[in-house]
Curated annotation (Swiss-Prot):
Gene Ontology CC: cytosol
Name of encoding gene: aroC
Role summary: This reaction introduces a second double bond into the aromatic ring system.
Subunit record text: Homotetramer.
Catalytic activity, reaction form: 5-O-(1-carboxyvinyl)-3-phosphoshikimate = chorismate + phosphate
Membership in a protein family: Belongs to the chorismate synthase family.
Binding site for NADP(+): 48, 54
PANTHER family referenced in this protein's UniProt entry, alphabetically: CHORISMATE SYNTHASE
Enzyme's top EC category: lyase
Catalytic activity, EC: 4.2.3.5
Top-level taxonomy: Bacteria, Pseudomonadati, Pseudomonadota, Gammaproteobacteria, Pseudomonadales
Xref: InterPro entries: Chorismate_synth, Chorismate_synth_AroC_sf, Chorismate_synthase_CS
Protein name: Chorismate synthase
Amino acid sequence: MSGNTYGKLFTVTTAGESHGPALVAIVDGCPPGLELTLEDLQRDLDRRKPGTSRHTTQRQEPDEVEILSGVFEGKTTGCSIGLLIRNTDQKSKDYSAIKDLFRPAHADYSYHHKYGIRDYRGGGRSSARETAMRVAAGAIAKKYLASQGIVIRGYMSQLGPIEIPFKTWDSVENNAFFSPDPDKVAELEAYMDQLRRDQDSVGAKITVVAEGVMPGLGEPIFDRLDAELAHALMSINAVKGVEIGAGFACVAQRGTEHRDELTPQGFLSNNAGGILGGISSGQPIVAHLALKPTSSITTPGRSIDIDGNPVDVITKGRHDPCVGIRATPIAEAMMAIVLMDHLLRHRGQNADVRVSTPVLGQL
């Protein structure tokens, strides 16, 4: 009812606010017997956590996850997995001056109209702080999917006006931007340093790829795999657009260019992003997501207070000048949660389906 749960067979429910005591999650539907440790979850949380470079928020949260249930002697039991991350570095006083004001482009105004009450400290439930639990839950899904030969990885493909070509996965984990091109890192750092001096923010584009996905995942018509991915990725804070495969570029393509022709040796292209008719084709699943510039900046912005009076708002506190810098692990997590759910759903209905047609890769 309140939109805090995702999934049908593999479900993730989260709770918690930016300046509350903790974030929690319940992950249900994970098959029993999966070897799972704190390190499996912490690895991705460390990739997302704040304060890891001068280009992100300086809020210092260790994001140390606790497993409360559903794991015994290092293996999942099949029962619900309870997760907890304690908040340790809140500075709620930073927001006392704006508790009766609406920050431009934030959820303050819309939350106020929906609920009649809102947690003004750091955005409360609408804060990207909430995504830490998505990453923890997604790490469980990634671990299981990896046991089935499915690998999910992401990278930053654009920061502001700077496009980042894909060169190598080896570069992605070796810089603060998740850049696949090591030669672009110095340019990205210089751009962010100038942005900070300008007291401004910028958007970004993230690409996330799933390899090893078997054909057949997806539930037409309303639960198409691409529709579910778009739903999940659009639910990430600050995401304003999602593309699958060629995405909006298909508008300028001709049919002879866009269609992914098949040969006995494999597909000749992947404009569909690994999904045909809402069902996985066996090719890599490719999604791109656009994140808006951070709305919390120190440059004054026009707004109103709760009585409708005009005000200028200056947002204090510690904020990411580009939320996209830490979004890659979040995008990976949401794609993993979707694929995990659909893998279990496919198994439940179609486990006995056998076809003689070979599974094609991409040339």
